[in-house]
């Protein structure tokens, strides 16, 4: 869960288990503004690390155990999401400059710059498909894929392809793209609805007729689907399930995205270790 300018791991009952604040981190003072308004928080490497972005420009990989920032970089104007590639390199999506950027993740130097950028209309999301070795992102109402060159030292995205296009009412304004737990499918949220794209059948259906969902995260049986629907501007102090029931609430929180701490085998192998 992200609260204004810091990141927390919490129980549903509101108990805070862990938090990370840039002000008390190793990030240089002049770079801390990059971490203003966190915008993504993906559990990676068997939920031992968090891959985060912030609207101020940051992308970062943070180790949960000791809160160490393993790598950080400037990822453009208003980053909304990031993804790990199989070799540990990172891709980030930034919406204001409408691009995705690729980084060589140098955990020895601890920082770096984008190796290359690629234009993507209103870029808001990036998801790796480990079965097909494809990177997905949305561009307007299109689902786009890229291939990766698997060159860790000189990473590049190639062979852009338009995979699927949404038509009709409620399809404008793509926002979150995230794997459906236990399925070979993606949740795809827009200004008007939540769609589910089935990769095998290449078909898209309406999963939930709910507007303005900024983040969605599902889990195994017994774990409700977690959503953020703004109640003020882009944020809310609570998270809901598809029926609108409040799953988590914290007074004065300005939450933008939330993810269950659950291994994501759509994007990463069951045993997923960082190469430091």
What do the predicted segments below correspond to?
Residues 9-34, 63, 68-75, 113-116, ...:
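Aromatic (tryptophan-biased) beta-strands that constitute blades/sheets of beta-rich domains
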Residues 170-241:
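Loop/turn-rich, solvent-exposed surfaces of beta-rich toroidal or solenoidal domains
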Residues 29-42, 76-85, 120-128, 168-181, ...:
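Repeated scaffold domains used in trafficking and secretory/extracellular systems
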Residues 102, 110-112, 117-162, 175-179:
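Solenoidal tandem-repeat scaffolds enriched in leucines and small polar residues
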Residues 46-49, 87-89, 131-133, 182-184, ...:
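Short coil/turn segments that connect the beta-strands within blades of beta-propeller domains
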Residues 1-3, 44, 51-56, 92-96, ...:
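Conserved beta-strand positions in repeat-built beta-propeller and related beta-rich domains
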Residues 4-7, 58-60, 98-101, 143-145, ...:
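Structural signal for beta-propeller blades
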Residues 10-14, 104-109, 146-157, 199-206:
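Short loop/turn segments immediately following beta-strands, especially the blade-tip
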């Amino acid at each position: 869960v992200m609260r204004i300018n810091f990141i927390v791991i919490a129980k549903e009952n509101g108990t805070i288990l862990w938090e990370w604040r840039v002000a008390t981190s190793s990030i240089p003072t002049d770079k801390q503004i990059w971490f203003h308004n966190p915008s993504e928080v993906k559990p990676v490497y068997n939920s031992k690390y968090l891959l985060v972005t912030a609207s101020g420009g940051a992308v970062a990989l943070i180790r949960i155990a000791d809160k160490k920032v393993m790598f950080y970089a400037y990822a453009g104007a208003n980053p909304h999401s990031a993804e790990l590639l199989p070799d540990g390199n990172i891709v980030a999506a930034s919406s204001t400059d409408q691009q995705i950027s690729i980084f060589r993740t140098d955990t020895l130097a601890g920082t770096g710059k984008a190796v290359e950028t690629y234009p993507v209309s209103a870029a808001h999301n990036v998801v790796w498909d480990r079965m097909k070795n494809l990177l997905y992102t949305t561009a307007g109402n299109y689902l786009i894929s890229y291939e990766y060159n698997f060159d860790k030292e000189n990473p590049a995205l190639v062979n852009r392809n338009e995979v699927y296009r949404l038509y009709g009412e409620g399809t404008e304004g793509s926002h979150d793209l995230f794997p459906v737990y236990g399925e070979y499918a993606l949740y795809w949220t827009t200004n008007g609805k939540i769609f589910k794209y089935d990769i095998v059948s290449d078909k898209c259906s309406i999963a939930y007729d709910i507007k303005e969902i900024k983040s969605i995260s599902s889990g195994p049986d017994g774990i409700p689907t977690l959503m953020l629907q703004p109640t003020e501007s882009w944020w809310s102090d609570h998270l809901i399930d598809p029926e609108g029931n409040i799953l988590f609430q914290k007074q004065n929180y300005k939450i933008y995205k939330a993810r269950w701490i659950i291994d994501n085998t759509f994007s990463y192998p069951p045993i997923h270790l960082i190469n430091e």
